[in-house]
A protein has these predicted regions:
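Conserved GNAT acetyl-CoA-binding A-motif
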Residues: 124-134
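Conserved acetyl-CoA pyrophosphate-binding loop and the N-cap/start of the following alpha-helix
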Residues: 106, 110-118
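Conserved beta-strand-loop-alpha-helix junction that forms the acyl-donor binding cleft
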Residues: 133-142, 161-164
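Acetyl-CoA-dependent GNAT
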Residues: 22-26, 33-92, 116, 122, ...
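Conserved active-site alpha-helix within GNAT-family acetyltransferase domains
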Residues: 113, 125, 137-156
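Conserved N-terminal entry element of GNAT/NAT acetyltransferase domains
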Residues: 2-26, 168-172
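Active-site acidic-Proline motif in GNAT/NAT acetyltransferases
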Residues: 103-105, 109, 137-138
C-alpha cells in the first residue's frame, strides 16, 4: 500500500491541511459518481441501482445518511457516507461507515486516514460508542490499512442480508 510507504510525518502534516465539508443537495451527482467509482473498484458495478432521485430522497429528505467530502483546496477528492446505528450492548448509538472512497490519483496521500479520523471525531463529539464498517475479504490493501489504524476485524460475526424479492417475500 502506498500510504505505508510515506514518511509518517509527511502524512500527518498533509492530514492537517485536509478540509472537509458536509454534502449539500447540489452534490447528489458527485455522490452518485463516487459511489459508481467505488463499485467499479469493488467489482460490483452491476449492483448499483441508486439514482439521483433515490439518493436525494434518502440522504436529504429522509435524512437517513450523511456525507462528508475530503477536499484538496476546493476540490472533492474523497468521501464517506455514514449513518447512526445502535448498540444494545453499549446502550448508545454508533456510526456505521457505509462507503469510504478516495479518487485513485489521491490514494496513498493520507486522505483515507483523514476521513476516518474525521468520522472518529464526529462519533466522539456525538457521544457514540463506536465506529464500524465492512470490508470485502479480498481487499487486502484496505484490510491492511484498517488494521494499521487499530481497527479490529470482527471474525466472530457474519453479515446477513435479505434484499429485493426475498425481502418482499419475508415481509408477507
Amino acid at each position: 500500500m502506498e500510504e505505508a510507504e510515506k514518511d509518517e510525518s509527511e502524512v500527518d502534516r498533509m492530514n492537517s491541511d485536509i478540509n472537509f465539508r458536509y454534502a449539500e443537495r447540489k452534490d447528489i451527482p458527485l455522490i452518485l459518481h463516487f459511489v459508481k467509482e467505488l463499485a467499479e473498484y469493488e467489482k460490483m458495478s452491476n449492483e448499483v441501482v441508486a439514482d439521483e432521485k433515490t439518493m436525494e430522497e434518502w440522504i436529504f429528505e429522509k435524512q437517513k445518511a450523511e456525507v462528508i467530502f475530503a477536499l484538496e483546496e476546493k476540490n472533492e477528492v474523497g468521501f464517506a457516507i455514514f449513518f447512526h446505528n445502535f448498540s444494545t450492548f453499549l446502550g448508545r448509538a454508533g456510526i456505521y461507515l457505509e462507503d469510504l472512497y478516495v479518487k485513485e490519483e489521491y490514494r496513498g496521500k493520507g486522505y483515507g486516514k483523514a476521513i476516518l479520523k474525521k468520522l472518529a471525531s464526529i462519533a466522539v463529539e456525538r457521544g457514540c460508542g463506536r465506529l464500524e464498517w465492512s470490508c470485502l475479504d479480498w481487499n487486502q490493501p484496505s484490510i491492511d490499512f484498517y488494521l494499521s489504524l487499530g481497527a479490529e476485524a470482527m471474525s466472530d460475526w457474519t453479515v446477513y442480508r435479505v434484499a429485493g424479492r426475498t425481502l418482499r417475500e419475508l415481509a408477507e
